[in-house]
Regions:
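Short beta-strand scaffold segments in enzyme catalytic cores
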Residues: 42-46, 134
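Covalent nucleotidyltransferase
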Residues: 53-216
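Single conserved hydrophobic/aromatic residue that forms the stacking wall/gate
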Residues: 278-296
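Long, charge-rich alpha-helical interaction segments
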Residues: 185-258
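Active-site-proximal "nucleotidyltransferase
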Residues: 1-41, 49, 53-112, 227-234, ...
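Residue-level detector of alpha-helical segments with a strong bias toward transmembrane helices
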Residues: 48-49, 292
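C-terminal structured domain segments
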Residues: 268-277, 281
């Protein structure tokens, strides 16, 4: 599937026990990660294999309806407005004509060394002299609603475009056997999501709790969920949310053991932070940050 949003490991339990087992295995065995930069908007660009033409666009290039693929400035004028249109014009003028399809996060226009495209502020060690700055992270072989994305993209800089290396993260040796065993023991008793309650409903509920800074405990998540939805028809139970919380803890343990090799400083609310410097002193805030930066 196109990388329209990041799938979070803890959400795997909402897709079934087998998917959750695969996510747990990935968390405890992964050695290399792709760092998700906090850029906006997402830019998709490359050569369309169907006609051989270079294009730029947003994630709307993967739409099932109202597909917005831009080959010219006129296409951009027709499909987009405002800041997004301005960014796409810069992208069309300055991106290299490559024979691949790449998704990247927009960081900004060159000429400076401090950028805050979204929540996280980035300080580069020196001024970026290229025209535009992007953080490429996913590649595709086609433009289709069901295109499969592949992480691990590293593009060479050009005269006009500065590409951030999003592959500069490795995992130190770590383990959490007790937490893994506890989570696996809960899986057979975790309720399955039924047809009367969509995955999107549960994701919205959990994301709302994270944004509000609520304490992420299984019982509290379940109680507030039952207050909104019919508990007899939603399928999920206390063990579902216990597994969700445990997998999120595993993810945070992994985040604690990530080492990056870049030299870009990161700031949130004016305070220095980085993957290797995030601690669990504020677990809810950390989980929000983890949602922003974590890719297997």
């Amino acid at each position: 599937m196109p990388n329209k949003h990041l799938e979070h490991p803890e959400d795997s339990i909402l897709q079934g026990r087998r998917v959750a087992i695969d996510a747990i295995k990935e968390l405890v065995t992964v050695t290399k990660l792709s760092v998700k930069w906090d850029g906006a908007p997402a830019i998709v660009f490359g050569t369309n294999p169907e006609n051989g033409k270079f294009f730029v666009g947003t994630k709307s290039v993967f739409n099932k309806r109202r597909i917005k693929i831009n080959y010219t400035h006129e296409d951009i004028d027709q499909n987009h407005q405002g800041t997004v249109a301005d960014i796409l014009r810069l992208a069309l003028d300055n991106l290299p004509r490559i024979n691949r399809i790449i998704q990247a996060d927009w960081i900004g226009v060159g000429g400076g060394n401090v950028y805050c495209p979204n929540t996280i502020k980035y300080r580069f060690p020196s001024t970026i002299n290229q025209q535009i700055i992007l953080a490429p992270h996913t590649s595709y072989v086609s433009i289709h609603p069901d295109s499969r994305g592949h992480f691990g993209v590293n593009l060479a800089n050009t005269e006009d475009c500065y590409f951030i290396d999003t592959t500069q993260a490795q995992v130190k040796t770590w383990s959490a056997p007790k937490l893994v065993a506890e989570t696996l023991a809960l899986l057979p008793f975790a309720g399955k999501v039924c047809e009367k309650c969509s995955l999107q409903d549960i994701r919205k509920h959990v994301n709302s709790a994270i944004r509000c800074g609520d304490k992420l405990e299984a019982s509290a998540l379940l109680e507030s969920f039952y207050a909104k939805y019919d508990k007899y028809n939603c399928g999920v139970n206390l063990n579902t949310f216990k597994v969700w919380v445990n997998i999120s803890k595993l993810k945070l343990r992994l985040l604690e053991n990530i080492e990056t090799t870049d030299n870009v400083e990161c700031f949130i609310d004016g305070k220095p932070t980085a993957l290797s410097l995030i601690h669990i002193s504020e677990p809810t805030r950390l989980l929000s940050i983890a949602y922003a930066v974590f890719c297997l």
